[in-house]
Curated annotation (Swiss-Prot):
Residue intervals passing through the bilayer: 23-43, 73-93, 109-129, 138-158, 167-187, 193-213, 219-239, 314-334, 348-368, 381-401, 419-439
Classification via Pfam families: Na_H_antiport_1 (PF06965)
Compartments, record wording: Cell inner membrane
GO MF, any single term: sodium:proton antiporter activity
Full protein name: Na(+)/H(+) antiporter NhaA
Stated role: Na(+)/H(+) antiporter that extrudes sodium in exchange for external protons.
Reaction catalysed by this enzyme: Na(+)(in) + 2 H(+)(out) = Na(+)(out) + 2 H(+)(in)
Lineage: Bacteria, Pseudomonadati, Bacteroidota, Bacteroidia, Bacteroidales
Keyword Hydrolase: no
Amino acid sequence: MEKLKILNLNFSFQRAAHYHINGGMLLMGVVLLAMFLANSPWGDIYASFWNYEVHLQIGEFNFFSHNGHHMTLMTFINDALMAVFFFSVGLEIKREILVGELSSFRQALLPIVAACGGMLVPVLIYYFMTAGTPAQSGLAIPMATDIAFSLGVLSLFGKRVPLSLKVFLTAFAVVDDIGGILVIALFYTSHLSVNYLIASAGILLILCGGNFFRVHNRWFYIFWGVIMWYLFLQSGIHATIAGVVAAFTVPATPHYKIGKYINRIRENIAVFPASDKESVVLSKMQINVLKSIESSSDRVISPLQSLEDSLHGMVNYIILPLFAFANAGVSLTADHGGLEVGMATWAVLAGLLAGKFAGIYFFTWLVIKMGFAGLLKGMTWVNLTGICLLGGIGFTVSLFIANLSFGDSPVLLTQAKMGVILGTVLAGVLAYLVLQFALPKQPAQE
């Protein structure tokens, strides 16, 4: 039974990793396209395109407006579509906490400590480089790791990569996501509307009630999650946080246990009419039995797993590429003709490249030397170096926090984005070079 559980977890991880890896490759292409357009003769058209307003209006009510402002395409992507991304992240975090690499203290300790170091050191480096300057407010930018990009780079080595390295990278990236979510919720709240917060709390009670009373219809959680998103948008708390909060209320237990499901399938097979095996047209009785099997199959998959599986494709192949296409198009030249770089650029670059590596590596070394954890199977101090460098690929959440930090300062925003893109590229290249040397030449034995 334990072996079956482990196999199921590995299958779940590998399926999720497949989406992340392919999505990471797509992101790379989209970033290059956005950079090309932003620095081409069509740069002004590219920049102005994202300022078109988005409306969903019924009478006088516009669903995509808040505080008297209408959403543009850019804010629709960053505030609405990215809420779906954070909903998916919330589902992944909940799964990891319940049955994954964060489900036990000893399992979780190494990636949690590594992630804490990977968040703390970049923030400190950024702070000391920008203290007392307008760029200081972006100190959370270099604390994130982009799981899709980093797994995309790791996938270039194919079966040479031990599964333990992929699991470790994914686990500490998930903890990074938790840190990023907390930062967004706590430090990027512009104002608070008590009435909308109270209404949001009411919706949260409905969602928690659905979980408590075992409501397994996933549309229940989607509907009330969308309402919560709108209330968060109006409340002043960043709307994407609604996605995470709603995700944590989605049930992780299926309606049917495996044993009951197997019995139901056997019962249906026993009554399935098979008199004419050559017929290409099913009888009404056969259709009814097959529908019963389909219904039972739906009920053995928990709402959490069902939603996570359904959203992976949309998030990795539509939402994140759109986000990258809208946000990564940075003009490389300033008005004076030079590169658009400044203190924010160098601080983000140092945080992602040096801070991430030093924080993850040192904190991992510390917790192992203190005897609280050990290196995972297939992990060495040399290939760990490459994984620590991959932690400096901060793309998606780093760009997202940059928008929140410098939304009112286009110059600082551009400088920070330059730092994110440079840091991501350099971290990816250095990680590739280190892992090319550190990983075994033959496929890893699991």
